[in-house]
């Protein structure tokens, strides 16, 4: 199957016109019912939805049938959330009905021993027989923030906030639990998500397939959590074609981590040294933590890329200037001296404590901030800015908003850190979509990641 044909079929996972939720019923705590409820009441999904259960009962006012073959209209996507033992039979029914896209959210397959592996092989056989592409098994589902479609089980009304704003970052998550952590963090911060897909055991559709798909849609940055790589050569070849930033946090770096991944999503052990080498060759940014999955992408969606490693540190605290210099140097960034021309311009601004790099502005007024930053960003010896404000004042918000405009004007990025209450920072990020980081280390890491992406793209163009 060529890439174009594959992406056309994968499109139905994210933009189905009709959905069947197999296993949805009115039994208390039924997970399939939470999907129907979300589609009906929270997302107001415009297409037909049906519930498949033994009693053929309605769920959330959607009609019920005892088999997908009884549904009188075509179905684009089936979501199966039933005991593992009956999943193969439902996959066969879907094939006979002509359904070519299935999300299998049920667990109990190759991650749980010989019997589970046998069931998974049956699913594979039916999928090949009928030309079905499927996600999972043992996955959370799919969310498309652009079209307001979501088949996550356990969806609740608070998730509606996440659908108020579509962003530029799409996520591929092997673990449903990690997906929930990322989703909740982004929802609290009101960062817009583009799409999120949980792949679980990824028996059919894997991370490379989705990377290919996201390369052709309106995604800006692709962020992944993996416990193993299904096919390293395939992933590397696809990644080399992609010009969008790819970020991956992979667990299983140690023997203990690999053992845990095996029991969780049936992952095959991958050599971490080989994976690290693949990332460098394919231009994949390897992340160090779960938090980086949702904190760092905004640096690449909201700021220009860092085109060199020469950084100006700008603060109203001499201590933070010293601390940041250590962190940046250890990270491979440099803190160059300003040129005589830049120093002359800076010296004309009154009331500045120190015009050397790092700059210590002291307790200055907003216009002083902006005048200094304008000079620094315009300086040819500077590639980017680390902006730190140790004192929170309301005018800092206005300063940061203007700095965002300056960065776009000069085509240079700024990583922003203010060591104040998280609630204040989140409030600003929610309102203005500004990449403010929760720690100085995170802000410096964002600059490093931006520079890594620029260097790889430049290398590809040669």
What is the meaning of each model-derived region?
Residues 1-462:
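Catalytic-core regions of core metabolic enzymes
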């Amino acid at each position: 199957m060529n890439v174009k044909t594959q992406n056309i079929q994968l499109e139905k996972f994210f933009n189905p016109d009709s959905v069947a939720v197999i296993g949805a019923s009115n039994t208390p705590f039924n997970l399939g019912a939470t999907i129907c409820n979300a589609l009906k009441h929270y997302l107001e999904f415009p297409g037909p939805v049906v519930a498949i259960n033994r009693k053929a009962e309605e769920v959330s006012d959607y009609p019920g049938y005892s088999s997908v073959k009884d549904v009188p209209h075509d179905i684009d996507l089936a979501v199966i959330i039933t005991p593992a033992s009956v999943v193969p039979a439902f996959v066969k029914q879907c094939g006979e009905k002509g359904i070519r896209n299935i999300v299998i959210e049920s667990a109990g397959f190759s991650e749980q021993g010989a019997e589970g592996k046998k069931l998974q092989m049956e699913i594979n056989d039916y999928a090949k027989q009928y030309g079905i592409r499927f996600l999972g098994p043992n996955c959370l589902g799919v969310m498309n923030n652009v079209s307001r479609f979501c088949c996550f089980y356990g969806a609740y009304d608070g998730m509606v906030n996440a659908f108020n704003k579509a962003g530029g970052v799409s996520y591929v998550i092997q673990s449903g639990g990690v997906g929930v952590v990322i989703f909740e963090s982004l929802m609290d911060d009101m960062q817009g998500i583009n799409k999120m897909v949980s792949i679980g055991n990824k028996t059919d559709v894997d991370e490379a397939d989705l990377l290919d798909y996201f390369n052709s849609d309106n995604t800006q940055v692709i962020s992944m959590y993996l416990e193993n790589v299904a096919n390293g050569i395939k992933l590397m070849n696809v990644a080399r074609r992609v010009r969008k930033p790819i970020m991956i946090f992979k667990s299983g770096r140690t023997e203990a981590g690999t053992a845990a991944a095996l029991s969780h999503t049936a992952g095959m052990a991958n050599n971490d040294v080989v994976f690290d080498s693949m990332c460098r060759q394919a231009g994949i940014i390897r992340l160090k933590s779960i938090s980086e999955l949702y904190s760092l992408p905004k640096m690449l969606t909201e700021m220009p890329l860092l085109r060199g490693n020469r950084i100006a540190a700008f603060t109203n605290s001499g201590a933070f200037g010293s601390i940041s210099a250590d962190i940046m140097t250890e990270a491979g960034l440099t803190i160059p001296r300003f040129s005589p021309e830049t120093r002359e311009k800076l010296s004309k601004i009154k009331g500045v404590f120190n015009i050397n790099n790092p700059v210590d502005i002291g307790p200055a007024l907003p216009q002083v901030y902006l005048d200094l930053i304008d000079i620094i960003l315009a300086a040819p010896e500077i590639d980017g800015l680390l902006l730190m404000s140790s004192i929170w004042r309301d005018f800092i918000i206005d300063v940061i908003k203007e700095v965002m405009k300056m960065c776009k004007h000069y085509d240079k990025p700024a990583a922003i850190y203010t060591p104040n209450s998280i609630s204040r920072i989140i409030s600003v990020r929610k309102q203005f979509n500004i990449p403010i980081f929760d720690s100085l280390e995170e802000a410096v890491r964002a600059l490093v990641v931006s520079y890594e992406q620029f260097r790889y793209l430049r290398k590809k163009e040669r």
